[in-house]
Amino acid sequence: MAGGRPHLKRSFSIIPCFVFVESVLLGIVILLAYRLEFTDTFPVHTQGFFCYDSTYAKPYPGPEAASRVPPALVYALVTAGPTLTILLGELARAFFPAPPSAVPVIGESTIVSGACCRFSPPVRRLVRFLGVYSFGLFTTTIFANAGQVVTGNPTPHFLSVCRPNYTALGCLPPSPDRPGPDRFVTDQGACAGSPSLVAAARRAFPCKDAALCAYAVTYTAMYVTLVFRVKGSRLVKPSLCLALLCPAFLVGVVRVAEYRNHWSDVLAGFLTGAAIATFLVTCVVHNFQSRPPSGRRLSPWEDLGQAPTMDSPLEKNPRSAGRIRHRHGSPHPSRRTAPAVAT
């Protein structure tokens, strides 16, 4: 800002781009996530299993709504938590600006579109960060559901809901002479249980709840670390970030403890969500920082000119400089002869 007045920038493409490009892309992502989650447009891959495999013989824990961390609670947390954090952070940044002695922050311009629409920097930042977060949230859902549909990896309680007829399948029970499973079943009609429960039990890898929680906490923790400014304390921001990471970890533990997912499913979900959040924060919203008002980027040579420099120790110590000059034959400054003056 110059003279306390904000920079004004006129743009006639911001509203059409938001309506016809970004909103359409977000709608496509939401529609694809809905198709993968609630319809059978993409059938789940039928993966075979070994007879009497103890890996998939855990008891049925009940419907998802009966879990200690039901999906409704997970969806509420991953939606409300980051939204409130970003909203409070942007409001604090707008009403309590950093003091002049703090690290300088590049200011944004106020966009004027047409004769009626004016978008201030706080509004632009809020819409940008929350819009990108929403896009990433549905993208994480797509990645998790696509992985479940393609792999068809059974849950730990798969055999409890599948209820296969081992006699009809020709499976023999384990014995001292044959401790392990003896046959791999690939028949699609091997399960006699409820088709809906069997289909849900084939969607274990990766864990969608773990992916959503990891995405939400990674995005929010990076926002807290990169945007919040706490003066005089080094432990406030790490404490907030660890407090955000704790619920996501507990969600993964509960999924494993209730025999709804394997540890590998939860870890894959954590990696998926964290990777998507890191990519969006780093490459899309540029670490939640504003871009310079001018569109021209510095060349590498100009950028080197702004790099921090280090003074030579010889310039700080004139005695050492004098010794080096004397050693190489240069006369000491005090012993130089004055130039002759013509008479």
UniProtKB/Swiss-Prot annotation:
Chain spans, region Disordered: 290-343
Keyword tags: Glycoprotein, Membrane, Phosphoprotein, Transmembrane, Transmembrane helix
GO-annotated cellular components: plasma membrane
Pfam families: PAP2
Biased segments, Basic residues type: 322-335
Record flagged with keyword Transmembrane helix: yes
Compartment(s) of residence: Membrane
Record membrane topology: Multi-pass membrane protein
Main location: membrane
Domain of life per record: Eukaryota
Any one GO MF annotation of this record: phosphatidate phosphatase activity
Protein family according to the UniProt entry: Belongs to the PA-phosphatase related phosphoesterase family.
Name recorded for this polypeptide: Phospholipid phosphatase-related protein type 2
Organism expressing this protein natively: Homo sapiens
